[in-house]
């Protein structure tokens, strides 16, 4: 598939193994939710696997690839999920897949690696003489396999150019929100952050939930106004502002 235009945003998620599907699914959901908040119509997602076959995970949960990874010669964003234990899976990955990742990176694709997916990025040569983050459980192994790469042991996430690294299978929301801001703006990022960070003890989160309680309806015009109120950078919203946004009279 050829390079997308500026009106489209293509995301390809590589699910390397049947474990830790959350590293892929939740990353896609963060971006998809942000695209909905931003009312971005050209958002496209694809899921691929190393052998182009379905993956079976815990409890019989399966991931079906929507395309073959070889069919993409460009994507705006490539998300590489956790590969589980690298000792069991890293050497089983087709060398051509590493070449593909390198080519995408050279063409300007953003490469997001989550948890032990960082091993894949390292083996593809994207971190040579550079820095990385890694889950503490696999940090020693990473140091043995890639001694030339400096591990930032006090960090959980790292962004270097078009490479985005998150060290845990369930702690990648901050990295994904950075991408949300780059493509959809700061206000959509803030909205997504509030949506993801709802905590019972947080007064701000509670008030945010109160707002969403009033958005459980199908009136498209009212929903448009409600989303606009949530994302606008105005401190005070007047009746005139609402009327202009809704293309209605103030009455």
Language-model features, listed with the residues they occupy:
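Short, surface-exposed amphipathic charged segments that create phosphate/polyanion-binding patches used
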Residues: 59-63, 147-149, 166-167
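Short, well-ordered, mixed-charge alpha-helical segments that flank or form enzyme active sites
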Residues: 87-88, 120-123, 129, 141-142, ...
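Extended, subdomain-level signal for the structured scaffold at the beginning of enzyme domains
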Residues: 1-111, 120-123, 181, 186, ...
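A conserved active-site-flanking secondary-structure segment within enzyme catalytic domains
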Residues: 128-156, 192
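Conserved anion/nucleotide-ligand pocket segment
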Residues: 154-195
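Residues that mark the start of a beta-strand
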Residues: 8-11, 131, 162
